Amino acid sequence: MPDLMIDHREKAHALLKADADKILRLIEVQIENLTMPQCPVYEDVLDTQMYGLSREIDFAVRLELISEIEGKALLENLEKKLNILHEASQNTL
């Protein structure tokens, strides 16, 4: 049974990481092709996606599939990458 729990934890972490990567790709495409970061639509999409991911992470933490520290690290890592992306888009204006 412990091996099964480890597998579920690894799978939960991988799924959350994949969702974070999808958000990053979505925002990259939006910045490159659709709108500027100051656009309300951009901000709404980003806020909605980040909120959704935070709820997924909270759910996984409550099920003890990942630790609270791992969840925070996933969000912080995504936020850092998004900030870098945002700064790069500002420098190209």
Curated annotation (Swiss-Prot):
Q: Name one Pfam family in it.
A: DUF1507
Write down the superkingdom of origin. Answer: Bacteria
| UniProt cross-references to InterPro entries, sorted A to Z | UPF0358, UPF0358_sf
Q: Which NCBIfam families match?
A: PRK13666.1
- Family membership, please give it: Belongs to the UPF0358 family.
Full protein name: UPF0358 protein OB1428
Q: Which organism is it from?
A: Oceanobacillus iheyensis (strain DSM 14371 / CIP 107618 / JCM 11309 / KCTC 3954 / HTE831)
From the broadest rank down, the organism's phylogenetic lineage runs: Bacteria, Bacillati, Bacillota, Bacilli, Bacillales
